[in-house]
Amino acid sequence: MSENKRVVVTGVGPLCSIGQGKDEVFNSLVNAKTNIELEKAYIGDQYIGSFYKHKIKDFDINNFGIDKQRLNEIKDWKEDEEITDLYFLLASIKLALVDSKVDFKGSKEMGLVVTHENPGLEQFISKVIDNSFEIAKANQEITKKDFFNKIYEVCNRSAYDLQTFMFLFHSAKTFNLHGFSLFVNNACASGLFAIETAVQTIKAGKNKIVVVAGSDYPGIYKHIWLGGLGLCTKDGKIKPFAKNRDGFIFGDGGAAIVLEDYDHAISRKAHIYSEYLGGGFTLESWKVTLPAVGDSFYREAILKSLKESRIKPDGVDVINAHGAGTGIIDQYEARAITDIFGENFEKPFITTLKPYIGHNLGSCALLEIVIQLIALEKNFIPPVLNCDEVDPKLKIKVVKEGIYSEDIKTVLKITCGFGGYDGAVVFKRGDV
């Protein structure tokens, strides 16, 4: 493996509630737009509850120039089931590939790393519930064996597709990508682990280009679980680091980023958004839903990213925080930041994007760094929405108004996920 190889970003594909594609997303970011809706959930025709969500409006997979025959093949394989999260993923990949201007048709030089927490799970749960109810209603004396056979008959394909390699397969086949491939599921930090994996693949010389992509389409079942843990805000507004923070809400979305060997990018005169400098990662191995507040794993991940990037804390211009908006996670994150950068510092600037786009779960870190890199190229730091008063106990300052500055050159993206997956990555602007 050559540590001297440089890896750069040559294409981005954001898809979320504030836009489809880099231009629409950036314009919404500058104007502090959001699209939060109250989603009503039903089982059959029975109303079971409502939850706030950052919704993608007017999404149509047919608008992205993806081969119609391939889309029909996927639809047939999925037996006409709802496959929105896969469509989000495919749309994001197409946006990024087109943006990169790379020839991706049948490339053995291009790899693919995909992230998601549980593709197809919500649809599968609904299918099992609906069919179980109909079977039981039609025959209340049914044996357990007969019940199993009937459920298996209607749900076996859906169950098979819960295997994450199928999500990767559908994506790679759609775009004829034949290089290194991997599916990453490290909770909220999946996107950062995926980026690091892609970078190491390029540095090892296995592929010149690797696409990293992810998506999530959270629904009522995830809301019931996480809401039951007290993690979802009641008013629909995520308030990161605020004194009155009370949880998050979900956001539809997907994202893709094209990572490329620097020399290869230069040889084809590709546009370079930014360069990957380094990453740091730790695993707490403590609790599933709580961070290890008594330890310093998150801080260690950040320090590792700075060391690998060969920059000191004062060389970071922007911190893009996880900013989940919950009491304990924001406290844990703030402590990791202040342990390294000090208390109530003016620089680096701290921002976070969940108030704009919601929590995209398994794809949140990837979506957020993609949007942050778009903003970085535009010399813009978005303000933290809904944070009228920072919790003084956190001892940090956040960006309250949008900042334009050509001095913004490096960004540190940090994420702490369920299960104790902590990640931090550093990028620098492509023209510096």
Question: Which sequence ranges carry the predicted segments?
Answer:
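ACP-dependent fatty acid/polyketide chain-elongation machinery
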Residues: 1-75, 263-275, 370-385, 423, ...
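Condensing-enzyme catalytic core mediating Claisen C-C bond formation in acyl metabolism
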Residues: 6-10, 33-39, 49, 236-309, ...
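Conserved beta-ketoacyl condensing-enzyme motif
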Residues: 9, 33-182, 215-221, 313-331
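Acyl-CoA/ACP chain-elongation machinery
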Residues: 37-43, 206-241, 245-246, 279-293, ...
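Active-site-proximal alpha-helical scaffold in enzymes
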Residues: 89-102, 164-175, 181-214, 250-270, ...
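Glycine-/small-residue-rich "gating" segment that lines the acyl/pantetheine channel
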Residues: 136-152, 196, 200-203, 217-267, ...
